[in-house]
């Protein structure tokens, strides 16, 4: 099993490319199942979750290949041909490691009238039920049962298409919105999704579907209208830049007292995070071709309290990374997690490095080290989920001595060559076998 060894104390400096967004690429790979024509996706990151999704759709009889970019730090191109798809089923063996595999349910059901998808796995950061997916597809006329760990969906006897419907989810759900959006493109009539997720990745998926011939309005708002069509065609689509990877590098550069250009980063997708960074004393600018960030120095940062909410609020996927920054800043901050339960598992590991954090339920209070003269000290820590692992890397970049991060397979699920990109910015970091 691989681990990362980090010798901290170096300010990150230079420029680094931001890869395509995992959370856009995964639903877009599933969207390719909606058509029998070839689909080409550009700027697809090389991640374990992407590899798992490709394996999943190949298992159905889909032809899919992922060619690499020109260098280790560039994303690649995926070509998919689902014309010969023969098995509309996603088995447990592949689904268990990745929650996003549930996104195959809507496209398979819409195109073939049936689908069998295992209940999903992924990071252990809460239950995150799929009941909203089932509720929405049922409103569109699907008959769905859950048995033996599988969701088994089919159209009623005599029906060849899902039916348009007005669907209001009980909560804002990104994957739920995406699943219902994809299913609605081939439904008979108009579907209205109320309380829809507004994330940039949802917007990017909608733009891909429109390029395939879908009729969609309102994406990026809480109400999306979809007029179903009888068939979709192939397309070429570029995956939007990963705002969470960009936010992670913003925090890493800020925490280490550095300066960098994040090529391809989209500042307009990170307003809530950038506002907090600026309040902390960090200079962040949207420039031609990316985002420029300059830190006043780790000891000069001002700790910031925040509360995670749905987009366009502060993203839960940036909570752990910003907490690592607060650890080395001046002052006391309060972090409230409202999206997922059990998402403070990184706190115990940060404590091993010398952080001062008290967590109780959904709230963590951080006493910054910036005005105490104390420093984080390297230690061996264990990644517990994807974003928690990123927070430990950031802390390790600041700590004195060597920090070893175990179980980095979590990191590989969501970051494309993170250690290589950090080395390009001057970090002393290497991947080794445990």
Curated annotation (Swiss-Prot):
Residues engaged in binding phosphoenolpyruvate: 22-23
Residue numbers carrying 2-(S-cysteinyl)pyruvic acid O-phosphothioketal: 123
Pfam families in the cross-refs: EPSP_synthase (PF00275)
Protein location: Cytoplasm
GO biological process, one term: cell wall organization
Active site positions, chain numbering: 123 (proton donor)
Statement: the UniProt record of this protein carries the keyword Ion transport: no
Annotated organism of origin: Paracidovorax citrulli (strain AAC00-1) (Acidovorax citrulli)
UniProt-listed Enzyme Commission number(s): 2.5.1.7
Key words of the record: Cell cycle, Cell division, Cell shape, Cell wall biogenesis/degradation, Cytoplasm, Peptidoglycan synthesis, Pyruvate, Transferase
Chief localization: cytoplasm
Residues the entry annotates as binding UDP-N-acetyl-alpha-D-glucosamine: 99, 128-132, 317, 339
Family listed: Belongs to the EPSP synthase family. MurA subfamily.
GO cellular component terms given for this protein: cytoplasm
Molecular functions per Gene Ontology: UDP-N-acetylglucosamine 1-carboxyvinyltransferase activity
HAMAP family: MurA
Function description: Cell wall formation. Adds enolpyruvyl to UDP-N-acetylglucosamine.
Pathway involvement of the protein, from the record: Cell wall biogenesis; peptidoglycan biosynthesis
Catalytic reactions on record: phosphoenolpyruvate + UDP-N-acetyl-alpha-D-glucosamine = UDP-N-acetyl-3-O-(1-carboxyvinyl)-alpha-D-glucosamine + phosphate
Keyword Cell cycle: yes
Protein name, per record: UDP-N-acetylglucosamine 1-carboxyvinyltransferase
